[in-house]
């Protein structure tokens, strides 16, 4: 374990006890820089259980930070693992699914599946965007996920058949 990883590991209990949404960004930077598996697992576990006020807003902002690109899949997975309400941000997840990697697309699909409520107008716009993106995507795996996300949203509007 590097000295930096040991320092991060030592600071985690204090963040866990007294942390608020402002702790999220430093945790993400620590995760991006951590090389030790134990440190990475501990930070990821803390993120997946985050319940602090404004956590969703802080995580959404972190998606646009270039230095945090290596941990974007973890950021995306945090939304659904922590059960954060992101109903007003469907466009962010659809945009990330379309522009991102296949792994990011998978995490966005999981967020969409796990969020119980999405605004109807956002759903309708997203269905069109996903349909167009799937037609233009070269990666067949990602195409399948984009179409699956489209299907999930269509089902929310009562347009598609239920899938299992």
Which residues does each PLM region occupy?
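Eukaryotic intrinsically disordered, low-complexity regulatory tails and linkers enriched
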Residues: 161-164
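Buried hydrophobic core positions in alpha-solenoid tandem helical repeats
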Residues: 26-28, 58-62, 90-95, 123-131
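Short inter-helical turns and helix N-cap capping residues of alpha-solenoid HEAT/ARM repeat scaffolds
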Residues: 3-4, 35-36, 67-68, 100-101, ...
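TPR/TPR-like (Sel1-like) alpha-helical repeat modules
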Residues: 95-101, 113-134
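Structural detector for internal amphipathic alpha-helices that build alpha-solenoid repeat scaffolds
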Residues: 6-19, 29-30, 38-52, 61, ...
